[in-house]
Amino acid sequence: MNDILKRCTLCPRECKVNRYEHRGFCGETAKVRIARAELHMWEEPCISGTEGSGTVFFSGCCLKCCFCQNYEISAEGKGFELTEQELADTFLRLQSMGANNINLVNPTHFVPQIIKALDICKDKLTIPVVYNSGGYEKPQTLELLRGYVQIFLPDLKYFDPTLSDKYSKAADYFENAAASIHKMAELSGKPTFDEKGIMQSGTIVRHLVLPTHRKDSIKLMEWLGNNFAKDEIMISLMSQFTPVYKAFDYKELCRKTSTFEYNTVIDTVNKYGFEGFVQSRTSAAKDFIPKFYDEKYY
């Protein structure tokens, strides 16, 4: 499977770089790099619970979002290398700390290495694996995860290709995200939960409402409503937009999302009867951005 990395086509960019010798569009080589691995309390309640989600933040990214809160690791290269054995050990360490799941944040460009790590620890890892991504995926790559990942947590960022090109350098974002979310829902099946209300399988589609662009958000919610049964997926609507990184290059992004903008999108979700989560408006703060590291700290 690692032969994919010799001519990388894991993400829709299909940069075809030999990542054993060079960095791909994502900014990463074939060596796994992460910037944090800890219990994370700020995911959806059915993911974090009271014990926390065993979250592993991977360095690099196949998107170029101007408003990325994690820009230190997605764009600026922060992180440290791990072998696949060390990654497997990290998963088991998080499980031993009481994590409800192993939460892989921005994992797309490291899928082959993650699968190897999961194979190493498969006899000891007993909690669900969460694939937490920006939604810019290929169904063919997701198929590799069949039997390895139980929960998918994708973003669905944009409907309009003009916006996805402007803010994330990905004019083909929606077409790829749409196909991938269908694939994720097929792989995970309908949402299931344990006796504590912690998700064991299923897909939660996340959407961050951007200032000025509520109509694009509404189109996305309508698309979900027209393409999925209300019990097939869950929706998590986020209001945490805070101008950071290169968002200040765009006047329309130099503010937080208004209550009016957010509520009109909530109304659309409610119209289709989806179960899910609505984020508190107080979440829109830099205090919720975790600290990232350049070297092993545990």
Can you describe what each PLM-predicted range is?
Residues 1-23, 190-298:
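Auxiliary Fe-S-binding modules of radical SAM enzymes
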Residues 28-152, 160-162:
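Conserved Radical SAM active-site core
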Residues 54, 102, 129-131, 152-154, ...:
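Hydrophobic faces of well-ordered beta-strands that scaffold small-molecule active sites
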Residues 74, 111, 135-138, 156-174, ...:
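Conserved radical SAM core fold
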Residues 82, 109, 168-176, 212, ...:
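Alpha-helix N-cap and loop-to-helix initiation/capping positions
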Residues 95-121, 166, 172, 182, ...:
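Conserved glycine-rich "GG(E/T)P / GGGxP" loop and the immediately following alpha-helix
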Residues 117-128, 180-184, 259-265:
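Alpha-helix-loop-beta-strand connector modules within alpha/beta enzyme cores
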Residues 165-196:
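Anionic-ligand binding region
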